[in-house]
Amino acid sequence: MGSRIERLPHRAPFLFVDEVVSADASVAHCAWNVGGREEFLKGHFPGRPLVPGVLITEALAQAAGIAVAADPAHANAAGGMLVHADVRFRRPVAPPARIELHASAEGGLGALHRFAVEARVDGAVVAEGRIVLAIQGSDNAAQE
């Protein structure tokens, strides 16, 4: 696990980001490689497995957390949680798939951080929207 991923509070089996392509204080590009043997696929759906949208949303939130962790202004921030998600799913994701996760900071206030997010598979958008994270120990100045 890379040091940026280790800054996330998540661990297996609920850590979905397995690669950080690039990250800075405002943007993270990450990836989640779904091989097809993951336990959750056994029931979603037998004979035609699909990656659950709620897990894609969580993976996008983890990518946003990577961007927060890459910001030196939030070096002491510890963990966080997804407090709001407005994500639209454009097409289903069947394994095997490399889900590219993009999160771009749009601003924040106090502990709240707002991100535009997008997930792609083979260049096609599979999910997009906005999420808000609450980061413990974060003291975002008002940004709009």
Residue spans of the language-model regions?
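Catalytic strand-loop segment that frames the active site of acyl-thioester-processing enzymes
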Residues: 12-51
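Hydrophobic beta-strand-centered segment that forms part of the acyl-chain substrate-binding groove
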Residues: 63-102, 126, 133-134
